[in-house]
Amino acid sequence: MENIKASTEQLCAEANIQRKKVSEVSKELLDFCEKNKTNDMLVSGPTDQHNPFQEKKSCSVL
């Protein structure tokens, strides 16, 4: 009986979720990505100042 009650509550919660069409959401996602691409390290790459993988420059005296 407890199982059925939990399933019913889960189904009610899922029924109340607001759904949108994929065509609308994909347009919003593209707009968001275009708007924020300058701050996205995966799109723009790290700057020289904030690149933890850049080789450290050292001075060697000969």
From Swiss-Prot:
Propeptide residues, chain positions: 60-62
SMART domains named in the record: G_gamma, GGL
Lipid-carrying residues in chain (S-geranylgeranyl cysteine): C59
Entry-linked CDD domains: GGL (cd00068)
Stored InterPro entries: G-protein_gamma-like_dom, GGL_sf, Gprotein-gamma
GO molecular function terms noted in the UniProt entry: G-protein beta-subunit binding
UniProt modified residues of type Cysteine methyl ester: C59
UniProt keyword terms in alphabetical order: Cell membrane, Lipoprotein, Membrane, Methylation, Prenylation, Transducer
Gene Ontology BP annotations: G protein-coupled receptor signaling pathway; sensory perception of taste
Functional summary from the UniProt entry: Guanine nucleotide-binding proteins (G proteins) are involved as a modulator or transducer in various transmembrane signaling systems. The beta and gamma chains are required for the GTPase activity, for replacement of GDP by GTP, and for G protein-effector interaction.
Protein name per the record: Guanine nucleotide-binding protein subunit gamma
